[in-house]
């Protein structure tokens, strides 16, 4: 019995390690997809943070993670860097963007913030953010990497001129938020499978 338990534990651990390795690969790959070739390092930068359904009254785990990704994605070489927080009141009374803005300030961020508070989908996040990012020389769309690439693809569809300014955010750190990474990779795989049908 003990031997069987050890074997089952080893199998479960191997499966979990394999799943995590797959999720890390998905994040690493998608963090490099749908980028532009015309960003200007040292110029004006807009970091677009895509929101996630949030009941409030404080930012939930996913939105806190996304804000942290947005903050660390800002370039110290940018002449100006603005955080563009996206998301309407989808899961509660307060827009996701406002919840994320509060959290960014709690983390000590004192720089400029622009809020997009009307959107209910990723496509709307991007469409509604366009006026807020149009003057930026470099644009970074961040979330978890498989979600961020969806946002970047929407920008390519809507405004290829702006999409050429897309640069990579810091959204694919090895070993970070493993449960969130696995969930995001599974959602991305299901979405891709549905699109193929």
Predicted region positions:
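Hydrophobic alpha-helical topogenic segments used for membrane insertion/localization
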Residues: 1-26
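A structural signal for short, hydrophobic/glycine-enriched beta-strand patches
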Residues: 23-188
């Amino acid at each position: 019995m003990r031997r069987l338990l050890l074997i089952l534990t080893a199998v479960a651990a191997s499966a979990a390690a394999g799943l995590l390795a797959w999720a890390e690969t998905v994040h690493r790959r998608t963090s490099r997809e749908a980028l532009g070739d015309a960003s200007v390092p040292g110029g004006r930068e807009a970091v677009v943070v895509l929101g996630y359904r949030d009941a409030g009254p404080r930012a939930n785990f996913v939105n806190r993670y996304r804000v942290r990704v947005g903050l660390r994605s800002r370039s110290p070489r940018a002449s100006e860097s603005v955080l563009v927080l996206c998301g309407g009141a989808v899961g509660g009374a307060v827009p996701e963007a406002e919840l994320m803005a509060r959290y960014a300030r709690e983390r000590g961020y004192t720089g400029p913030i622009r809020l997009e508070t009307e959107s209910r989908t990723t496509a709307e996040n991007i469409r509604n953010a366009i006026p807020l990012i149009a003057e930026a020389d470099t644009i970074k769309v961040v979330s978890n990497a498989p979600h961020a690439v969806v946002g970047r693809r929407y920008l390519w569809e809507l405004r290829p001129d702006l999409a050429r300014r897309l640069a990579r955010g810091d959204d694919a750190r090895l070993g970070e938020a493993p449960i969130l990474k696995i969930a995001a990779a599974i959602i991305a795989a299901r979405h891709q499978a549905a699109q193929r049908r």
